[in-house]
UniProtKB/Swiss-Prot annotation:
Protein name per UniProt: ATP synthase subunit c
Transmembrane segments: 13-33, 55-75
HAMAP family given in the database record: ATP_synth_c_bact (MF_01396)
The protein's role, per its UniProt record: F(1)F(0) ATP synthase produces ATP from ADP in the presence of a proton or sodium gradient. F-type ATPases consist of two structural domains, F(1) containing the extramembraneous catalytic core and F(0) containing the membrane proton channel, linked together by a central stalk and a peripheral stalk. During catalysis, ATP synthesis in the catalytic domain of F(1) is coupled via a rotary mechanism of the central stalk subunits to proton translocation. Key component of the F(0) channel; it plays a direct role in translocation across the membrane. A homomeric c-ring of between 10-14 subunits forms the central stalk rotor element with the F(1) delta and epsilon subunits.
Origin: domain of life: Bacteria
Highest classification ranks of the organism: Bacteria, Bacillati, Actinomycetota, Actinomycetes, Bifidobacteriales
Organism: Bifidobacterium longum subsp. infantis (strain ATCC 15697 / DSM 20088 / JCM 1222 / NCTC 11817 / S12)
Site features described as Reversibly protonated during proton transport, chain residue numbers: 62
GO CC entries: plasma membrane; proton-transporting ATP synthase complex; proton-transporting two-sector ATPase complex, proton-transporting domain
Family matches, as Pfam families: ATP-synt_C
Amino acid sequence: MDIITLAEVAGNLSVIGYGIGTLGPGIGLGILFGKAMESTARQPEMSGKIQTIMFIGLALVEVLALIGFVAALIIR
């Protein structure tokens, strides 16, 4: 194999790795929003506090996806 083919394979593997790495944050966001809606339906008077905590959790979960993206770019 020549060097160009190896570089293409490494690039494709990093994209596949990033795709797999986004599964966790995607599932986490689904659970986060589902539980936030459930909590708001159960206690509507706490909706402001629940929303604030939800946005903090959203930021923490999205950081995982961004770290995966940066790692894919660095490895490439």
